[in-house]
Amino acid sequence: MAKIDNRPEPPGSELSAPVALAAEHELSDFDCGEPALNEWLRSCALKNESRFSRTYVVCAGRRVVAYVCISAGAVERAAAPGKVRRNAPDAIPVSIVGRLAVDRRFAGKGLGADMLADALRRIAVASQSIGMAAVLVHAKNDAAKRFYLRCAEFLEYPNNSRTLFLPIETVVAVFG
């Protein structure tokens, strides 16, 4: 990862490549501007590592400056767009990008898109070992929805909703 320019950061603030969240990472100063995302990182991310999700972080030193959370899930066939539900069982396996956030001090430099790309690479690798039909995102707000639609060929379903699907074939074609 490239160093973020024009930011007053302490010496040694070169950004790490995305790594799995660990107890030694500093979470207390993280502020993406969304209290719910800040609180989830501080209170839930490490607890969820054992069974429910995986969180990957980029750090300046030990301080987390961006994170993405991925997990497995399923959607009902009727709740998926045609391209995803075609020939699918009643419960369609998906990978979920549950949360993605960048500290405000590092925003606007492409780090969010980098985190999404890293998550999609990991999902592409996992799809070679386990079945899944798509990546699912429930965008938190319209700005988040625009971000995901800019970054990849997500499908809105139902139309004009914040529920987004990215067919696994697209993920594998780009990141596999």
Language model: regions and residue ranges:
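Non-catalytic substrate-recognition and accessory regions of acyl/acetyltransferase enzymes
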Residues: 1-109, 113-176
